[in-house]
Amino acid sequence: MPKSVIIPAGSSAPLAPFVPGTLADGVVYVSGTLAFDQHNNVLFADDPKAQTRHVLEIIRKVIETAGGTMADVTFNSIFITDWKNYAAINEIYAEFFPGDKPARFCIQCGLVKPDALVEIATIAHIAK
């Protein structure tokens, strides 16, 4: 099964040993994505809506680079640092998935940096 590395134009390579996404057999796997700038600094500290929007925009770029759309997303893994942000995160999330929603889970946990509020990893199946 050949796989392709997906790095959207204009994005920097992660500073850890992973890539933004991979494509294999029509399936896009998007790495856990946070609201970081190109130097791994957290963007929009204390703003769960802005962080969620930024994260989902990055995910959309990865999927589009692979030839898909957000409608191809079948599963999201969502990690949040505080349940008080759940409604705000869902509000923005719903904007990116206006039709049929993908399956998902959401857990509260610590993230790699204290100001990071949400991380999302995604799987999308691109129609051939």
From Swiss-Prot:
The keyword Electron transport does not apply. It catalyses: (Z)-3-aminoacrylate + H2O + H(+) = 3-oxopropanoate + NH4(+). InterPro entries: RidA_CS, RutC, RutC-like_sf, YjgF/YER057c/UK114. Transmembrane segments: none annotated. Keywords: Hydrolase. Its EC number is 3.5.-.-. It comes from the Bacteria. PROSITE patterns: UPF0076 (PS01094). GO terms for molecular function: deaminase activity. It holds the Pfam family Ribonuc_L-PSP. Belongs to the RutC family. NCBIfam families: RutC. Homotrimer. This is 3-aminoacrylate deaminase RutC. It comes from Escherichia coli (strain 55989 / EAEC). The lineage of its organism: Bacteria, Pseudomonadati, Pseudomonadota, Gammaproteobacteria, Enterobacterales. The gene is rutC.
